[in-house]
Curated annotation (Swiss-Prot):
InterPro entries: ATPase_NBD (IPR043129), Carb_kinase_FGGY (IPR000577), Carb_kinase_FGGY_CS (IPR018483), FGGY_C (IPR018485), FGGY_N (IPR018484), Glycerol_kin (IPR005999). Coiled coil: none annotated. Its EC number is 2.7.1.30. One of its GO terms (cellular component) is cytosol. Activated by phosphorylation and inhibited by fructose 1,6-bisphosphate (FBP). This is Glycerol kinase. Sn-glycerol 3-phosphate binds at residues 12, 82-83, 134, 244. The keyword Kinase applies. It catalyses: glycerol + ATP = sn-glycerol 3-phosphate + ADP + H(+). GO terms for molecular function: ATP binding; glycerol kinase activity.
Amino acid sequence: METYILSLDQGTTSSRAILFNKEGKIVHSAQKEFTQYFPHPGWVEHNANEIWGSVLAVIASVISESGISASQIAGIGITNQRETTVVWDKDTGSPVYNAIVWQSRQTSGICEELREKGYNDKFREKTGLLIDPYFSGTKVKWILDNVEGAREKAEKGELLFGTIDTWLIWKMSGGKAHVTDYSNASRTLMFNIYDLKWDDELLDILGVPKSMLPEVKPSSHVYAETVDYHFFGKNIPIAGAAGDQQSALFGQACFEEGMGKNTYGTGCFMLMNTGEKAIKSEHGLLTTIAWGIDGKVNYALEGSIFVAGSAIQWLRDGLRMFQDSSLSESYAEKVDSTDGVYVVPAFVGLGTPYWDSDVRGSVFGLTRGTTKEHFIRATLESLAYQTKDVLDAMEADSNISLKTLRVDGGAVKNNFLMQFQGDLLNVPVERPEINETTALGAAYLAGIAVGFWKDRSEIANQWNLDKRFEPELEEEKRNELYKGWQKAVKAAMAFK
């Protein structure tokens, strides 16, 4: 009887279940969206029970539609939207408040206060992160400070905290396992990435009782088994977990030091594996844990680009330049260049390496000769320029030159963008056959833990190339184009 690994990809707008076979190929998948709540401007929340319901629904869909039985699932891997925070009652299992999503800015006042008290360097030294509403620590503090009775219950040991992986493992195991993995713990602003434990001093500053926190385990590990009443009468090992970007790095088989991947989604997330050493960034990058496996922890440098695919959506929905995003490629290829036009898509500020939340989107170099095609091409090129900003910061911090860039996400179907990316970086860009690398990474982590796959070398052999984009641009032209981008960013930042 053939067996499979079930990967649960719990994202910001939907939950997906994907069944993988021994060759790392997709057998079946299901997806279900859930509600986004915006109680105030800048706030983003989810209903944690609704997320759980969506996960159960996609698992049921995959099992019933694929025709396999639950006994054929060798293990379950989880990958999740990172930083999103759930606090729930240990006895009843009910969340005390909505899940506060990674995008939500509702803790900006808390962050401002912590920065004013001079804590930024302390958090950075221990966690590799900045004090920012993005991360979980201030979200937990906000819930304890703002939900009636929450702090008292937390101090009595009655409340639990978890990122989405922790919440799902707790629910799937019937409340038996309160755990997280190293990659998710490293995004909380409460975990010391050098000592590999929750940091008492940081917990004290944030006012978060240690009793709320999950046990931190390797990313490839049998955490618990599912309770049978949710899983068709079977106890299935829950055996792997990683935050979505780290999971994509694993799914792209970036196992060696200096290997990197860029995910082109709503924004871009670029990660470079730095091996067993954590590199402290001097250039606006985050230092994070890639995964913990085989008794060792791998670290990564991470750069965040806030606007990527959403810039293409803006051309489609806001400016109505085309009806389907896939048409952006053919429009861009109708012209030889942007004719000097630069689009800086800073709709919500700029991320790595600038970290400027006040700058706004700008367009430079317009003339009477500028056409729709020039504008579309310039917007697509902005994704590649921002990626170069991040890669330059990574190479400066690590003294490692990237040999190839592996790519995934929705925008990688755009051949024009991928070729321009390779040209600009002067590095080959590799697009894999399977674009679902985030879900695949979680499947691999679970599969290794249950012996479905032997080790990372077996997985590396499964990585198959769809297309390699070799750089073709002359150095002089590349430098000239990038200098124009740098001028445009500088001008955009000056205009506030």
